[in-house]
Amino acid sequence: FMPVPIKFGTRTETLPKPEDAKEEDPAPTQEVDDIINNPTPAWTKKPSDLKDEDYKAFYRELYPMQFEEPLFHIHLNVDYPFNLTGILYFPKLNQDLAMQKDRIQLYQNQVYITDNVEGIVPEFLTMLRGVIDSPDIPLNVSRSYLQADGAVKKISSYITRKVGDKLNSLFKEDRENFEKKWNDIKIVIEYGMLSEDKFFEKADGFALYPTVDGAYYTFSELQEKVKDSQTDKDDKLVLLYASDKEGQHSYIEAAKAKGYQVLMMDSPIVSHLMQKLETSKEKISFARVDADHLDKLIQKEETQISKLSDEEKDKLKGQVEEVLGEKSSYMVQMEAMDSNASPFMITEPEFMRRMKEMQQSGGGGMFGMGNMPDMYNLVVNTNHPLMGEILNTKTSKKRIRLINQCLDLARLSKGLLKGEELTSFIHRSYDMVK
């Protein structure tokens, strides 16, 4: 892309035939200079002189091995207080945060410098592609010097603002199309919300929170939608979410049956984002649908009364723990729930699981949590009719069979029943229907 044509010999160019030429006559040719560079790339032109197809053609010129079209582009053009031109592209991004091979390229006066733009471009935007051209970026200096340079700070701030403005305009001009692209661009936006406070503020107007049913809300829309049903007795808004629509299906359906909205939050940095939102917004908390039973996740003034006495609950708890055995890692909780709810439910405490996820995805959480085993609670619904049957069963064989069946169904619902235990459950289930 150097600003002067670079000639590499000559090439033969075929010209159109004259109108009076015969069909068998060969087409005329001429020798022309073989120019091997593009001295007027798209970023040197005015945005008004370019069409959408011109931007796509330039993307293919930059990244010939990329076969997917970019989702959209941002044309950068400023001459005060610094000089900078360029085009940034939002590619389709996968869920992992691994560094991509094709990155933003840095030029000075159309001369290629590097594709390592850390310190110049905000970290969350290094996942984008494209070109930045600026004579005001100092070269051959340390990264710490680069990050402290006043011009570079202004350039970084300008790029962040332009990206935020572009996303905001896309959202306002064609929300339906923006929603369709959300899953392909959310990782950049969420990363930006975590790492740049100014971007976090701007993104509040266009960052989306999809539900498991495919509806999309901004945060303010979401608050308005759920405030009546999902505000607990302490006046805190509890936002329920799932990370695996299929794996957590039974928990999702139980929440929907109570009229609750369940968000779909499955990006690798979602635990960090939720913590940021909980600390920056007032009186909100996030809870995954399988973190506890619903009456505990969203506690209301009225509470369920247990059909079992304290003595019966202690007896039942002992019977369940006896079947689980000493090596069991489950913490048994006796809870008065709706009689139509599951007899047994396996839950994963929100705080411990989230700390572990944050540690595994890098940064945050508690040191060493990433290697800790998963923690599960076994919630026993004391109001389910089966609990009375277990307590009143005359033979220990039937009681153990009922407890095992309830336990395995709970583990199956949570995706924890595997291998030999799954095979045993299948055989036992066949025996029951013979």
Language-model-derived ranges and their functions:
Residues 1-434:
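Conserved GHKL (Bergerat-fold) ATPase module
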